[in-house]
């Protein structure tokens, strides 16, 4: 076959050029029930050519439900995994996913899914925890990894994400490398720590966000590599939801809080390394910081979005570490237009390092994430709507919130339903599912205000959250619930964290029955 000049330039290890294949030539390698690893994190840096070829094969041969795989990715993959879900090609998926087709398949029971702390998922995979049912002692049959270059020693230069690729390659029987020639080479911005298992594991030596070990590519045994495939498809990241009055209000509350912490000496003037999740609230917070005159900021996070480019360009941000650069097409164009300056202030690491509790605590990270709901005592649900319907997965929120110096959650105070513009309260009497406990959360912010929960007892937290964060439509209801719960608990000598179990989920049951959480009354309790 003809090898493009671009591919020859990117693949600097000559023996690999003898392994160049078209994606469709690899179809016979894939068998029903295999265990696959994909590169990628938050929809970027994922393989495209081989997954698409497998979709075409399933479509042409009516193999829906007959060619299915156990699929492991560092976090969410690109649109390919949703097409795999639509074609019934996934048996099991972990640890995080984004997209309506795959979430629908999970909630209909057609895909078995488990989520896991992203700092732990790759290492637990290498331990064999997720493949205990295998009889051949293998972990992964194939890892399909996207590269933007291959160095002279055969090692892999990833693209805009690292994720769990180092661990996947270590425990994979065979490796397929997709070299993406539609994306510029990312060589020089990665820092790769290869997995070392206990009892031989050593502490990560990093003391600042820009410290590095100096390994900028992923080592791989060339004998494992069965094929090189050229990919010419760029990552498809949809446009970000623009900030609105709600998200800007949250950002304003946070900026004011940070200024007050600096004023009282609890934070330095350049704050501490920032972690921010995904979504329009997270983007609005970063946009707010860009206009807040904070200088010499640093970032230690999972994912960098377009809003961080503003911080780089206005000189506010000195350095950022992440495991993924999830930029829209316009965002990548902005980054590549100023690539020489940009790449020296950015480091992409594996997710076991970016999300590592040891590093998060040592650096004193300020963590900011968005929950589904938070109850009056500060237990947060990040994953399961009404306790049962999976959204995306836990992700890295708990990695950061459990270990950060400041653990912050932000959310709208209310969301609309079909029958009520404020039919869903983010603040509920009892969370229908708990991912982050009351012991993990320092600050809660909604468009209504900011609740500082540090050092408060449960009853004090409840009053603070209701008064500062609940939507006005729900403040009286929540206060009434708390008053009644305290009255009941006082009679029964259980006043530490008062609840009425008979009414604890009445917001949720009322929503299911009437389309709103605005309950008419509480059940009487003795």
Swiss-Prot record:
One of its GO terms (molecular function) is acetate CoA-transferase activity. The modification N-acetylthreonine is found at residue 2. It is found in: Cytoplasm. Present with 4890 molecules/cell in log phase SD medium. Presumably involved in regulating the intracellular acetyl-CoA pool for fatty acid and cholesterol synthesis and fatty acid oxidation. It may be involved in overall regulation of acetylation during melatonin synthesis. CoA binds at residues 277-281, 392, 396. InterPro entries: AcetylCoA_hyd_C, AcetylCoA_hyd_C_sf, ActCoA_hydro, ActCoA_hydro_N, NagB/RpiA_transferase-like. The active site is at 302 (5-glutamyl coenzyme a thioester intermediate). One of its GO terms (cellular component) is cytosol. It catalyses: acetyl-CoA + H2O = acetate + CoA + H(+). Keywords: Acetylation, Cytoplasm, Glycoprotein, Hydrolase, Phosphoprotein. The keyword Acetylation applies. SUPFAM superfamilies: NagB/RpiA/CoA transferase-like. Monomer. Glycosylated; contains mannose. Its EC number is 3.1.2.1. One of its GO terms (biological process) is acetate metabolic process. The lineage of its organism: Eukaryota, Fungi, Dikarya, Ascomycota, Saccharomycotina. This is Acetyl-CoA hydrolase. Belongs to the acetyl-CoA hydrolase/transferase family. The modification Phosphoserine is found at residue 350. It is an enzyme of class 3 (hydrolase).
């Amino acid at each position: 076959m003809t090898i493009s000049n671009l591919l020859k330039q990117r693949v600097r290890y000559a023996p690999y050029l003898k392994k160049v294949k078209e994606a469709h030539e690899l179809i016979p390698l894939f068998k029903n029930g295999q265990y696959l690893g994909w590169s990628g994190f938050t929809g970027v840096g994922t393989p495209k050519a081989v997954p698409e070829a497998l979709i075409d094969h399933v479509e042409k041969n009516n193999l829906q439900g007959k060619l299915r795989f156990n699929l492991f990715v560092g976090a969410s993959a690109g649109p390919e995994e949703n097409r795999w879900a639509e074609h019934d090609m996934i048996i099991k998926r972990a640890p995080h996913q984004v997209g309506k087709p795959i979430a629908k398949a999970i909630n209909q029971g057609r895909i078995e899914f488990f989520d896991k702390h992203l700092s732990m998922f790759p290492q637990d995979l290498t331990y064999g925890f997720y493949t205990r049912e295998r009889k051949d002692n293998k972990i992964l049959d194939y890892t399909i990894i996207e590269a933007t270059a291959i160095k002279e020693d055969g090692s892999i230069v990833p693209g805009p994400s690292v994720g769990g690729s180092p661990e996947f390659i270590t425990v994979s029987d065979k490796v397929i490398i997709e070299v993406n020639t539609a994306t510029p080479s990312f060589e020089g911005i990665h820092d790769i720590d290869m997995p070392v298992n206990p009892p031989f594991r050593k502490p990560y030596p990093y003391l600042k966000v820009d410290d590095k070990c100096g390994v900028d590519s992923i080592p791989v045994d060339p004998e494992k590599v069965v094929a090189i495939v050229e990919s010419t498809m760029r990552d498809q990241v949809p446009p970000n939801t623009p900030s609105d009055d709600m998200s800007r209000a949250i950002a304003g509350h946070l900026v004011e809080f940070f200024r007050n912490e600096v004023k009282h000496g609890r934070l330095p003037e350049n704050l501490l390394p920032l972690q921010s999740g995904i979504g329009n609230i997270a983007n609005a917070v970063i946009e707010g910081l860009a206009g807040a005159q904070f200088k010499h900021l640093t970032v230690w996070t999972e994912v960098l979005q377009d809003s961080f480019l503003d911080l780089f360009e206005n000189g506010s941000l000195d350095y950022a570490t992440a495991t993924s650069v999830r930029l829209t097409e316009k965002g990548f164009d902005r980054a590549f237009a100023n690539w020489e300056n940009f790449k020296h202030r950015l480091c992409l690491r594996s997710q076991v390092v970016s999300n590592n509790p040891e590093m998060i605590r040592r650096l004193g990270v300020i963590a900011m994430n968005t929950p589904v709901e938070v109850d009056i005592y500060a237990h947060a649900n990040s994953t399961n709507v009404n306790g049962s319907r999976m959204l995306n997965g836990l992700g890295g929120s708990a990695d950061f919130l459990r270990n950060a110096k400041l653990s912050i959650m932000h959310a709208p105070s209310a969301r609309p339903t079909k029958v009520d513009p404020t039919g869903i309260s983010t603040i509920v009497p009892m969370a229908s599912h708990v991912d982050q406990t009351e012991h993990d959360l320092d600050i809660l912010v909604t468009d209504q205000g900011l609740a500082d929960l540090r050092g408060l007892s449960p009853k004090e937290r409840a009053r603070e959250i209701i008064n500062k964060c609940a939507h006005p439509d729900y403040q009286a209801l929540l206060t009434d619930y708390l008053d009644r719960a305290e009255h009941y608990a006082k009679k029964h000598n259980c006043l530490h964290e008062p609840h009425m179990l008979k009414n604890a989920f009445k917001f949720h049951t009322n929503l299911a029955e009437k389309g709103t959480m605005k309950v008419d009354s509480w059940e009487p309790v003795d």
